[in-house]
Amino acid sequence: MDKSSGLDFINQMFPVEASLSCVESFMQKICDEIRRVDATILAVVSQQGNSGTRAKENLNDAICAAEELSHKIQEIKSKAEQTEAMVQDICSDIKKLDFAKKNITTAVTALSRLTMLVSAVQQLQVMTSKRQYKEAATQLEAINELCNHFKAYMDLPKIMELREKLKNIKQILKFHVFSDFSSLGTGTETEELFLLKKLSDSCLVVDALEPSVREELINNFCSRELTSYEQIYVGAELKTLDEIELIYNQLSCLIRKNQGKWTIFPASWHVPYRLCIQLSRKTRVQVESILVNLKEKSDVEKLLLELKRTLEFERELEMKFGGGGSIGDDIIGGGGNNSQKFNFRGMISSCFEPHLTIYIEKEEMELMQLLEKVVQEETWDIEEELGCHSENSVYLMLLDAHDMKMILLKVPSLARQPEASALLVKTATASYVKLVNHQMKRAEAVLKVIASPIVTVIDTYRALFPEETPMEFQRILVLKGLTKAEQQSILDDFNNHSSRITQLSVAAKTPEAHALPLALTNVAPAVRFKANSEEVLTRAASAATTSFMKLYALTGAAKDRPFRKLFNP
């Protein structure tokens, strides 16, 4: 406490002089307070000394407890290591026991399956001797399943012995099945019905054997069924078209007679289809031989009749044994597939195609005769009043040309077969459309120039025929029905304004209009490629004779004779 503070305290305690009378009592009070504080300090110091002693004792106790805990931890660690070693020993023993259990289980299972296999082979041997095909098929499937479990033990003597025994039993089964099939058709009707049921069961056995056995059985059966057909026609000298009908009748009779017998085979084998494929191939050879060996030119009507009968026969086969889908020439391989569909279109009838030339020649001859008739019936006197009738006729011919173009473009699809290759159809159709468009474009251009007014005929001609000559332009003016004076006036104007032509061509050229019939004559290959009957050619020829033939006749005659009323309604 500084001096000022002490003075302030004294002044506060003794503000007036009269208060100094209480100094002694005040001093006594202060002394008592000092003694109390000293006693408190002494008690605290004494207590603190006792606390240090207790703290040292507590520290010693804690050190002892820590040492004891460390000792116990060491003991626990030691016991844990001992326990771990014991567990490892136990696990090792358990693993050995697991391997032993697995080996024992495998051995027991293998022995059990071996017992079942031995028993099944013995039962199969008994069934084979009794020709119990249905039971043998089920047993053979079970044996094949059991044999799959012994693939890893094929070198064991017992397994090799069983395999050899099973192989011999399968050979015996195969022999019995083939023997029963060879006896088909040699017994009475009752015996045949019983044998058919038996052979139907034997097919189950063949399915359980190797695939090669099934193929061999099918080939043998087909060869046997074809024997009667081959005895009649193979090697025989066939010369006339009438014999084709006899062949189809014989085939239809053979199919009807044996169709019930073919049902013994599973559908997945496709035996009727494969048999009919072979029949169709042999028939194709015979029909082709007849067509090649014809000594004189065959009658078109009779040839088309036999072609129609061939197509009908193919449709009959397809309805009974096909279903549409893949190409008939593709013989199915082994194994079969229920999802496959087949057809017989074109297998026999395709051999007629090289011999249809006479039909095409006949159609061309009839078209040319009709063309000549149309030309001969026309008179070529000039009529001054032609006028609007000519223009109306030209517009009508433009419509006819457009309709004819649409008909020609539809020709490839009129009798298109659904199973034809998409790429082949697309390529053929594209080339055919290009040909028709090219040929018809020029015909339509000629008609448009003819239909144009006189004042714009030059501009129309230059726009549609930029590379043509005045000679071609003059011929179109003739077709337009103009007088010579009108033609000369227009030609002079054409030559004066032409930057490319300096003089009229006097060389004798074939008129371009003569190329127009190509749109008709080139239709024949496309029709032959896509159509199956003469209906398509008839429709195309009919359309051509209504309008396009008129244009062809007109352009051919316009070179030397004046225009008449060919365009009149």
Swiss-Prot record:
Sorted alphabetically, the keyword list is: Coiled coil, Cytoplasm, Endosome, Golgi apparatus, Membrane, Protein transport, Transport
UniProt GO cellular component terms: cytosol; endosome membrane; GARP complex
How would you describe this protein's topology in the membrane? Peripheral membrane protein
Note the coiled coil stretches, chain numbering.
53-90, 125-145, 295-316
Q: Which InterPro entries would you find in this protein's record?
A: Vps53, Vps53_C, Vps53_N
GO BP field: protein transport; retrograde transport, endosome to Golgi
Locations listed in the record: Cytoplasm; Golgi apparatus, trans-Golgi network membrane; Endosome membrane
Q: Which cysteines are joined by disulfide bonds?
A: none
Q: Which family does it belong to?
A: Belongs to the VPS53 family.
Q: Quaternary structure?
A: Component of the Golgi-associated retrograde protein (GARP) complex.
Q: What does this protein do?
A: Involved in retrograde transport from early and late endosomes to late Golgi, leading to the membrane fusion between late Golgi and endosomal vesicles.
The name under which this protein is listed is Vacuolar protein sorting-associated protein 53 B
